Amino acid sequence: MNQQSTKTSDLIKAIIKKGTLKQEVYHKTLDIFNEFKSQSKTLVENNKEIVKKAKFPLLFEFSNHSAFEFQLKFGSDILIFFMHSNIFELPRDHEVMKTPYIKDDKTRSYGGLIHIFNFLADSFRYNRTNDLGYLIGRIFVNRELHYFIEGKREIGLLYNNFSYARLNQKTIKSILHSAILYTLNFDLLTPPFDNMKEVTVQEMQTTLDAMSIRTGKRLGFRFQADQVEE
């Protein structure tokens, strides 16, 4: 075999190796995403009759939108679960890259991503396209089903042991419940007065549902409208 043939052979081997790795990670991530989807659907089916007995009508629905997206609606909130179709490698400066788990096998640093977004249900119901949503959790899954979550508060703190933590039905249920509880406790706060005090005639003439005044949950704000600078 001449030198050119050897280079071509090495190239094909590299293509097969990297492609096979990414396909393995992709299918493992899709399996995990489908388990999230299945458990969300089951949660609604098993409890919707109980929710119907509440004093007022409450939103409690599951809806499948595609192979890579589903929505879980409850109360005034929506959780959107979205799986990215591509596979990613962790950045070299990421803390996980310093662990023996990754140093022993670099292919473990490749993973799929599952995003969990929180939106207000009314934002979709009334087509308020300027409303804000928040990424409350991002799940990184590798080919061995090891995972960690980058997320808000307890979501990110509870699930960040990548070297040892593996996804299964039990951990998926725990993550799902944590995401719902976090959303329930992440309340809508009154927007800062300075952001609201000036409104155009056009905005006032438009229906309230279509106004370009954003509505979204806030992590908090300082009341500054009446403060005088010293």
For the regions a language model picked out, list residue spans one by one:
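N-terminal, Lys/Arg- and Ser/Thr-rich interaction peptides
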Residues: 1-22
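Glycine-rich, aromatic-bearing surface loops/beta-hairpins
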Residues: 137-230
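Hydrophobic-cavity lipid-handling domains and compact docking modules
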Residues: 57, 61-145, 150-157
